[in-house]
Amino acid sequence: MTSFSRGDIVLVKFVFADEEGAKQRPGLIVSTARYHQGRRETILAAITSNVGRLLVGDYKIKAWRECGLLYPSIVTGIVRTIKHDMVAGRMGELPASELHAVENKLRESLAL
């Protein structure tokens, strides 16, 4: 059982390739509770504070402060599968209307 849900913005611990250190970055949980059942992984979309350009699949978060983010941010079209133990904590939740917009961007990116 996970302590996070679809639409949650979480802090993820990414280990450097040389395994000499790690950095924490935010991500948006996009997988469902059903997906999480019996798995040790979750699917998330990366979040960046580099808002200088929007690429296909990117969505600029309007309620970034309310979501617990420190800076204006973009949910990117970069989707990753990570182990549950990489999630360092929950920062907040993306409002339903914005999650719907992200879903539309993912559909566009993945031709779903």
Question: What spans do the regions from the language model cover?
Answer:
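C-terminal terminal-subdomain/extension
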Residues: 2, 64-112
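Compact nucleic-acid interaction/catalytic patches
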Residues: 20-24, 29-63
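Short, charged beta-turn/beta-strand-edge "cap" motif at the junction between a beta-strand
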Residues: 15-19
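Short, surface-exposed secondary-structure edge patches
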Residues: 1-3, 21
